[in-house]
Regions:
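GST-like fold's C-terminal all-alpha helical module
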Residues: 80-199
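C-terminal active-site "lid" helix and adjoining low-complexity regulatory extension at the edge
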Residues: 197-210
Length: 210
């Protein structure tokens, strides 16, 4: 969203090992992302943040739709299904979980000890407690789950390039955000052979002002 509309902002990294210290104590600030306006206004969770930014800084153009029911249906679908599919592909096996936590520790601004604690203590928690149960509950391998979701989503475009038609709308950017969250990790290679999904993903990337 921010890169798509070219909005200047300050990005603050949060070390998950120190989240309680780095995030304010308000109950709603228990996880990232959090958007804080210059006047102190706070918005939490990805989709509400994107709606807020679009309305305040982009004239609400990404939220505008000729079919509100279709937009609302697929926005809920993305938040429900794509969001839950990120954990299984990143942490669905012990090896995947280790690769992910190791990669996170290298990407983020952790201290020497925090990097190693997160990489080696984090992966059994994410795999054993969270991801494994989601994979078991769904029954599909993470790659198949993502391919099925990408097929379902891109089929909804009809003959258009984007869900929003000739240009991306908020639903496109929400779905793109979930898929992009996997891109820094080796597991993203499991998605690159989905032709329609990658064509849409690259088309969204081309709109980013970076």
């Amino acid at each position: 969203m921010l890169e798509h509309i070219g909005l200047e902002h300050e990005k603050v990294q949060v070390n998950p090992m120190k989240a309680k210290k780095q995030l304010p104590s308000a109950p709603e600030w228990t996880k990232v992302p959090v958007w804080v306006e210059a006047d102190g206004e706070i918005i939490t969770d990805s989709t509400p943040i994107m709606k807020h930014i679009d309305a305040k800084y982009n004239g609400g153009s990404l939220w505008n739709s000729e079919d509100d029911a279709r937009r609302d249906k697929w926005l809920e679908w993305a938040d429900l299904h794509m969001s839950k599919a990120t954990i299984p592909i990143l942490y669905g096996s012990m090896f995947s979980a280790l690769k992910t936590t190791t990669r996170v520790s290298k990407l983020e601004k952790f201290g020497f000890i925090s990097k190693r604690l997160y990489a080696w203590a984090g992966f059994p928690i994410m795999w054993g407690i969270i991801a494994r149960s989601r994979v078991k509950k769904d029954g599909r391998k993470p790659k198949q789950l993502w391919h099925d979701l990408l097929s379902e989503f891109t089929d909804s475009f009809g003959d258009a390039e984007f869900f929003g038609g000739k240009s991306p709308d908020l639903v496109d950017l929400v779905a793109f955000g979930y898929m992009r969250s996997i891109s820094p990790y080796p597991q993203f290679s499991q998605l690159t052979d989905h032709e329609a999904g990658m064509a849409w993903y690259r088309a969204i990337e081309a709109t980013l002002k970076v």
